[in-house]
């Protein structure tokens, strides 16, 4: 009887956790085609849409977010934890994985903790300069920690903490060297996999306000499902070329196209910008631990990006940042060189080799 070589990747919620997990899964299977990768997530996360579409089996458990201000929400999560742990233990017994990798998100904590307690090989991948609470706790129990930012190491415990960079989707990594010169100035905007209302409203207001800044400007804007209809209707009156999308599946195409991006401060967005050498204007998502702000600050300190705090985001401020970059080609060229230093090639393969060694 052939023993299945299962590896489990736990986590999700947003594209910033799911797509790096998929990149790791593909790298594992490339190194050893006999490996079967299973994903564990929750019903509320985007993994329920993305993972099956990518061809991997997905198992769902109960979990939630502890790092919230609402006492009611925190209580709901606390009640889900024992259920999620029991589901995790049962699933681990069924799959008997060679390794369990947590990539962050609701399901990562309980599943990796259960796997560590039982005695399975475990690892966590931390995308942010300031690790989240779950990974700070899990780092004490797991065999290996993989980090994107070197600054994260001082916040984690454990004997094996390795800086590997951000696992970038294979189709994006393959397209890195295909960027081309643009006649117009190309601005790509997105607020993460689910969109950002404040970025959507600010950028659309800035564009519709017209003025010198829209001359020879071309915009591609991923809006997310909640705002797509309303904002794309607004853009019909835009004084420049605008392509609104609900969701962009072929991000590599538009990274090749873009001169600058306006985005949140998730590590995935930063890594993909670094891979293509695109200057980001980052609007960090406010959160309890401000991990996106700390990610953005890492870039700003190295003159590799710009940051606008959400409380300071206005059409005027956004236009000012875009125009200051657009007007100074030498500055842009230097910032492109700087952000490329944040890119570690073949990160997913590095992680896969560490798992399989």
Swiss-Prot record:
It is an enzyme of class 2 (transferase). Its EC number is 2.4.1.227. One of its GO terms (biological process) is lipid glycosylation. One of its GO terms (cellular component) is plasma membrane. GO terms for molecular function: UDP-N-acetyl-D-glucosamine:N-acetylmuramoyl-L-alanyl-D-glutamyl-meso-2,6-diaminopimelyl-D-alanyl-D-alanine-diphosphoundecaprenol 4-beta-N-acetylglucosaminlytransferase activity; undecaprenyldiphospho-muramoylpentapeptide beta-N-acetylglucosaminyltransferase activity. PANTHER family: GLYCOSYLTRANSFERASE, UDP-N-ACETYLGLUCOSAMINE--N-ACETYLMURAMYL-(PENTAPEPTIDE) PYROPHOSPHORYL-UNDECAPRENOL N-ACETYLGLUCOSAMINE TRANSFERASE 1. This is UDP-N-acetylglucosamine--N-acetylmuramyl-(pentapeptide) pyrophosphoryl-undecaprenol N-acetylglucosamine transferase. The gene is murG.
């Amino acid at each position: 009887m052939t023993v299945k070589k299962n590896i489990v990747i736990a986590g999700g919620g947003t594209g910033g956790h799911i797509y790096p997990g998929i990149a790791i899964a593909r790298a594992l299977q490339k190194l050893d085609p006999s490996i079967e990768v299973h994903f564990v997530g929750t019903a509320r996360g985007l993994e329920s849409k993305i993972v099956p579409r990518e061809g991997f089996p997905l198992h769902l458990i109960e979990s939630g977010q502890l790092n919230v201000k609402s006492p009611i929400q925190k209580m709901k999560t606390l009640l889900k934890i024992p259920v999620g742990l029991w589901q995790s233990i049962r699933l681990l017994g069924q799959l008997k994985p060679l390794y369990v990798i947590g990539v962050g998100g609701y399901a990562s904590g309980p599943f990796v903790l259960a796997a560590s307690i039982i005695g399975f090989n475990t690892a966590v991948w931390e995308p942010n300069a300031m690790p989240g609470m779950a990974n700070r706790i899990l780092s004490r129990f797991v065999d290996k920690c993989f980090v994107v930012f070197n600054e994260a190491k001082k916040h984690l415990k454990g004997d094996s903490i390795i800086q590997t960079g951000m696992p970038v989707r294979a189709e994006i990594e393959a397209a890195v060297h295909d960027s081309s010169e643009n006649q117009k100035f190309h601005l790509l905007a997105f607020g993460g996999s689910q969109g950002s209302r404040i970025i959507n409203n600010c950028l659309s207001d800035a564009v519709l306000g017209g003025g010198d800044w829209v001359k020879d400007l071309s915009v591609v804007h991923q809006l997310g499902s909640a705002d797509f209809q309303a904002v794309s209707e607004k853009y019909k009156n835009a004084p420049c070329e605008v392509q609104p999308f609900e969701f962009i599946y072929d991000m590599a195409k538009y990274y090749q196209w873009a001169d600058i991006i306006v985005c949140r401060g998730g590590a995935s967005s930063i890594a993909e910008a670094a891979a293509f050498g695109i200057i980001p204007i980052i609007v960090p998502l406010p959160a309890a631990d401000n991990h996106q702000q700390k990610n953005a600050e890492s870039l700003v300190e190295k003159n590799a990006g710009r940051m606008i705090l959400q409380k300071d985001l206005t059409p005027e401020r956004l236009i000012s940042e875009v125009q200051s970059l657009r007007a100074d080609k030498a500055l842009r060229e230097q910032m492109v060189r700087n952000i490329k230093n944040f890119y570690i090639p073949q990160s997913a393969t590095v992680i896969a080799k560490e798992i399989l060694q």
